[in-house]
Amino acid sequence: CGGNSAAGGPGFIPGLVRTIPPATVQQTHGLTSCSEWTGVSLSLLLDQAGVKPKGIWIIAEGEERGMHTKSIPIEKAMDDVLVVYGQNGEPIRPEQGYPLRLLVPGWEGINSVKWLRRIKVTHQPAMGMKEMTRYTRLLSNGKSHWFEFEMGPKSVITRPSGGQQLSGPGFYEIT
């Protein structure tokens, strides 16, 4: 998803009214995580397949319902993208995309396709439903800008968190 800190509050889901004040980091800064990933560089796989990095796209296809696909320019695919099989020292869990998922650092999470089943190399991006309708930016002139990718780094203080209060003056560990 591209909802950087979209914790499901008002405005994120039309008509949602929050009745309980947020108390945890995921409630106030949801859709954030920190993991150590294990995998293979996509550029290594593409090199071994004989792909020439010029003016083409890769299309990552996942086993999600609706056959989730994302188009990624070859320049990014050959940079720091990984095909991952491990998270935090263990195999990826099913809810995180087992057995394989794409990891696209610095880009919206929707590009890190879970349950990866196929990677295609093409001369044009896929025009799937999500790419055409959900992950576009409407410009002031009424036109749409497709293929929004980058998402800047983010830091969140997790401790103290939510409703926690410091007991008074002194030294505290902030994490």
Located regions from the model:
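Structured, non-membrane catalytic/scaffold regions adjacent to prosthetic-group chemistry
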Residues: 1-175
